Amino acid sequence: MLSSVCVSSFRGRQGASKQQPAPPPQPPESPPPPPLPPQQQQPAQPGPAASPAGPPAPRGPGDRRAEPCPGLPAAAMGRHGGGGGDSGKIVINVGGVRHETYRSTLRTLPGTRLAGLTEPEAAARFDYDPGADEFFFDRHPGVFAYVLNYYRTGKLHCPADVCGPLFEEELGFWGIDETDVEACCWMTYRQHRDAEEALDSFEAPDPAGAANAANAAGAHDGGLDDEAGAGGGGLDGAGGELKRLCFQDAGGGAGGPPGGAGGAGGTWWRRWQPRVWALFEDPYSSRAARYVAFASLFFILISITTFCLETHEGFIHISNKTVTQASPIPGAPPENITNVEVETEPFLTYVEGVCVVWFTFEFLMRITFCPDKVEFLKSSLNIIDCVAILPFYLEVGLSGLSSKAAKDVLGFLRVVRFVRILRIFKLTRHFVGLRVLGHTLRASTNEFLLLIIFLALGVLIFATMIYYAERIGADPDDILGSNHTYFKNIPIGFWWAVVTMTTLGYGDMYPKTWSGMLVGALCALAGVLTIAMPVPVIVNNFGMYYSLAMAKQKLPKKKNKHIPRPPQPGSPNYCKPDPPPPPPPHPHHGSGGISPPPPITPPSMGVTVAGAYPAGPHTHPGLLRGGAGGLGIMGLPPLPAPGEPCPLAQEEVIEINRADPRPNGDPAAAALAHEDCPAIDQPAMSPEDKSPITPGSRGRYSRDRACFLLTDYAPSPDGSIRKATGAPPLPPQDWRKPGPPSFLPDLNANAAAWISP
């Protein structure tokens, strides 16, 4: 989600009046203009006193600031800004907790955020408080203690009382790789990922969000009221992706334009497809979906009950049917053949027919309104539905045929009736425990394979041992030595070993010799130990999935999601664009002491066009000013006269992506944008190559700094936006100074260079 951060433009008189009460700002530091020839020099005018910080530092490559922070004591700059030796101490205030360490300690991990505090321009790039002589970071103080200890000892441990995502976010902010976590804490660190993966398997579309999307897509329906149940979080894994696809489509249609899928001109399909799909697929999406789920559950139970009763003797009728056939012998009388047929009660067949009709209707509705037919047919539950329905229709269609082929097919279909029992798996859509069992079996595949391997090895070993142990003490007259024992060969011993190792002990086979009894005792003990090893892992998986499923069901629905407030004026993140750097002397501005015109600043990425153009009496009436014949540029409003308030001096808006889980410290984003911290995972850069960061308001001074949210962009000749790499723009001058209009042609050329046609 995008939220706006207001950044004052400081252009015009009205913009300055919008600022909150603050100490008197110091005049902006800009390099002195190039010396003019003696005949062109103007009389010196009184100006503000020089800053105690000394003359401004020269510009670095890329027109980035590299001057020291104004108002910062020289001693502090020497201590924190790069002066002094590695033995100097540094104070870091993290979330109100002060930490003190040596600068040499922070340099042990170059390229990280803390290592940037030891660089010369650290006081200007980070939030430095000259009064308290400390750097401030509004982050988690408890996690920072572990991070700082990593710099001291070289070992990164994970606190047990901190949630994994929080620790991961803090590591990303400080620029530390998570792979540096010690092996002893790695399992503790990644526990949150296991929990997130387990929750994703139970993840479902938000019932409220789905209903809102459906309501926005069309008219309200009384039978589709939004009433999320207590168990609105569970879905079967086979159809979860289909549900997400459907609700994504619903959300896209609901948020579309008025004439699109979500507006009044939307099609009937886009309006009703998500609703009908949720009606038959997600029992927690609405009250009507609950009724459909209850009906489906009722017919499933009736179908299974009917299937079981068909095998009971009380519902089976044996009938003898006599069929007269022509004798194969010519001239012989017809023969009467009596066939014995087994039939079930007719009412059971009628009940099964009603159930099949419901299952057919449900299957057709689900496959018709499914957002992805391919994914639908890949689902195991949907395959079971289709296979359980087809035999009934084939049996009804072939029942009237008397050919031998038809009877063979009918016999096969009666055998295939057992597929109907698989409908019991459809209950997983309605019961959390069954879904938990399914997820547990899938998550414990490795443990099951390990258990099978252990059992296979034990069965092979003990079956061989019992075969030869029973041969000890055999009758000398018994050539095979198997007359006195049940174990006549090793394959028979496999069955005995499985029964013994699983502690079942049917008693159909048992050893009769003392050596065989000893082998049997060892087999039972080995079976207990073998099964006991992987079973706790499977039980733990079941407990984890069950607890997460219950927690997800009992988790209250969040109606109002917390969104962090945008930085306010006076906060470290409330910053202003840097004034443009000085240009080289212009060849056409060397006479009469006339100040060269400032450039027409192009709107930066994410900044409103208003406020991008300065105002003043210098403005060319046909280029920027509206009025008598004035056209203005790009549809901008006319600029005011000197005595009029400036409507363009308004706050610029910069958009920050708040959806980033680590909005304040994604190391990849910081490394790509060269923002807010030294480049992470990149070679060390000179101080001139790095963009300074706005110091916080905790220092008692006010000064314009380069905002880490802004980068310099210029339009290319073809109208596209690109980073400015050409000559630096003209310096800011006093627009109130009168001067002849000799520079107007150059101003037009400058405007044409900045503004795409």
From Swiss-Prot:
Is GTP-binding there in the keyword field? no
CDD domains per record: BTB_KCNC1_3
Q: What is known of its domains?
A: The segment S4 is probably the voltage-sensor and is characterized by a series of positively charged amino acids at every third position.
GO cellular component term, pick one: dendrite membrane
Q: What is this protein called?
A: Voltage-gated potassium channel KCNC3
Q: Where is the composition biased (Low complexity)?
A: 41-52, 210-219
Keywords attached to this Swiss-Prot or TrEMBL record, sorted alphabetically, are: Cell membrane, Cell projection, Cytoplasm, Cytoskeleton, Disease variant, Glycoprotein, Ion channel, Ion transport, Membrane, Metal-binding, Methylation, Neurodegeneration, Phosphoprotein, Postsynaptic cell membrane, Potassium, Potassium channel, Potassium transport, Spinocerebellar ataxia, Synapse, Transmembrane, Transmembrane helix, Transport, Voltage-gated channel, Zinc
The major lineage groups are: Eukaryota, Metazoa, Chordata, Craniata, Vertebrata
Q: Which organism is it from?
A: Homo sapiens
The question of whether Cell membrane is a record keyword is answered with: yes
